[in-house]
């Protein structure tokens, strides 16, 4: 009897410990889930109107041929974004701050100038994308649509300023899900053939134009302002933990954060190309985003077309606010200036409204804005790999040697592809 009692006590004790372990696991998972968010804000840059233009053009012209480029670009981008967030967590500095600390004033001013031009080019693309969506949905003139996009993006930034980063992350994540629904809704009507999709994962090109579009996809995917921004987002959200278990845990959560966010962004980009390949191949009216909308309307119906336009609008609104946020972080980090967000919003909105008012082709302007962004890629990615591979900067959290080598390969490859994009665009 005593033996049975001891056995029962042992089982109860063991069950209690298992229950405590399960409770701790649930608490840990709940806490880890709460810590997700910064990467989802940065991921908005990967589903902006520039991506829509590049992916739709690729699918309409070459079908599934360049699907592998989207996959490769998103894998590269995931590594870059993780390194950016890691820098912010470990050093307590954003990438612009870490770079500016190592420069004299003239060099910092020059570096800020190129970064600011890139941020403004980003904003032009986002505002134009939102204006196109509003014209599609409500037949509004492009300048009016641009103003509305700018005002709404300012309201989103006001949430971040007055209610904190966590609520801002939730709103942006919700918009990311709207974008995902908008560009994947067509798969409920018709799905691409699996063999064709698998064939698109085999790396290959088909003439010079496919190389240009591949470079455009890469240029629209790895965005310099997202690289600058993510380091600051991670620092502001998680602080600057001391070396030890807490830092290791936050870095682990950050890997999950980046992985999930980039999986969604990559899936949306792939969906854009697949929708175009499935429904727009061979049509002559898909050279513009509006043409793509009409093609979706004709082949899949009004409901799917409206969801496509809603996805585009959410893309323009969310990415415009994120772009302005990145610009403010760049200025603060390099020049230690803090400009009121309203003033900054008006300054960056000016070029976009001028382009829309003067009657330039909006889709062509979107493509050219990606070329301007291409100039900024090396200035963001190369210093990031160097800093995160430096023991003097990162201490015991320096990149593993293999990670650093892969980072250099990715940085050089992305930079060369963007140089190729610039050359091919300039030479026609």
Swiss-Prot record:
Listed name of the protein: Divalent metal cation transporter MntH
Compartments it resides in: Cell membrane
GO biological process, one term: zinc ion import across plasma membrane
TM region(s), chain numbering: 33-53, 60-80, 114-134, 136-156, 171-191, 210-230, 258-278, 299-319, 334-356, 365-385, 406-426
Pfam hit, one: Nramp
Disulfide bond entries: none
Example of a GO cellular component annotation carried by this entry: plasma membrane
Topological relation to the membrane, as annotated: Multi-pass membrane protein
Recorded family membership: Belongs to the NRAMP family.
Null allele phenotype: Disruption impairs growth under conditions of limited iron avaibility, but does not affect virulence in mice.
pH dependence: Optimum pH is 5.5-6.5.
GO terms for MF: cadmium ion transmembrane transporter activity; manganese ion transmembrane transporter activity; metal ion binding; symporter activity
Gene designation: mntH
Stored NCBIfam families: nramp (TIGR01197), Nramp_1 (NF037982), PRK00701.1 (NF001923)
Top-level taxon of origin: Bacteria
Inducing stimuli: Up-regulated in response to iron and copper.
Keyword set, alphabetical order: Cell membrane, Ion transport, Iron, Membrane, Symport, Transmembrane, Transmembrane helix, Transport, Zinc
InterPro entries per record: NRAMP_fam
Principal location listed in the UniProt entry: membrane
Purpose: H(+)-stimulated, divalent metal cation uptake system. Transports zinc and iron. Can also interact with manganese and copper.
């Amino acid at each position: 009897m005593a033996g049975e009692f001891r056995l029962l006590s042992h089982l109860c004790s063991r069950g209690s410990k298992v229950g405590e372990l399960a409770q701790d696991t649930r608490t840990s998972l709940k806490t880890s889930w709460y810590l997700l968010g910064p990467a989802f804000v940065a991921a908005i840059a990967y589903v902006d109107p520039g991506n829509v233009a590049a992916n739709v053009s690729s699918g309409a012209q070459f079908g599934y041929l360049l699907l592998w480029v989207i996959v490769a670009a998103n894998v590269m981008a995931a590594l870059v974004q993780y390194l950016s967030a890691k820098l912010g967590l470990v050093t307590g500095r954003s990438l612009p701050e870490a770079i500016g600390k190592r420069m004299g004033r003239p060099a910092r001013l020059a570096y800020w100038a190129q970064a600011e031009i890139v941020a403004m080019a980003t904003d032009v693309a986002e505002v134009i994308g939102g204006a196109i969506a509003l014209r599609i949905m409500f037949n509004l003139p492009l300048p009016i649509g641009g103003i509305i996009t700018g005002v709404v993006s300012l309201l989103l930034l006001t949430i971040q300023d007055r209610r904190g980063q966590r609520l801002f992350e939730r709103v942006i994540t919700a918009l990311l899900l709207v974008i995902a629904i908008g560009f994947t809704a067509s798969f409920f009507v018709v799905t691409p053939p699996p063999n064709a999709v698998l064939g698109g994962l085999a790396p290959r090109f088909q003439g010079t134009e496919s190389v240009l579009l591949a470079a455009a996809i890469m240029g629209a995917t790895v965005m310099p302002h997202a690289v600058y921004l993510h380091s600051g987002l991670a620092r502001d959200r998680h602080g600057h933990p001391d070396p030890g278990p807490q830092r290791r845990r936050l870095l682990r959560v950050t890997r999950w954060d980046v992985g999930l966010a980039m999986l969604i962004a990559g899936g949306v980009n792939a969906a854009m190309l697949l929708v175009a390949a499935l429904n727009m191949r061979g049509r002559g009216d898909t050279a513009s985003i509006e043409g793509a909308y009409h093609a979706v309307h004709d082949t899949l119906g009004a409901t799917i077309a409206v969801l496509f336009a809603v996805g585009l609008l959410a893309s323009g609104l969310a990415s415009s606010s994120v772009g302005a946020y990145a610009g403010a972080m760049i200025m603060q980090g390099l020049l230690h200036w803090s400009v009121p967000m309203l003033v900054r919003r008006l300054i960056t909105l000016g070029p976009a409204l001028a382009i829309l008012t003067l009657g330039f082709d909006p889709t062509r302007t979107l493509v050219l804005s990606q070329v301007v962004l291409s100039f900024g890629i090396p200035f963001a990615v190369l210093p990031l790999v160097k800093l995160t591979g430096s023991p003097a900067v990162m201490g015991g959290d320096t990149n593993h040697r293999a990670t650093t080598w892969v980072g250099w390969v990715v940085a050089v490859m992305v930079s060369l592809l963007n140089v190729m994009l610039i050359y091919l665009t300039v030479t026609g």
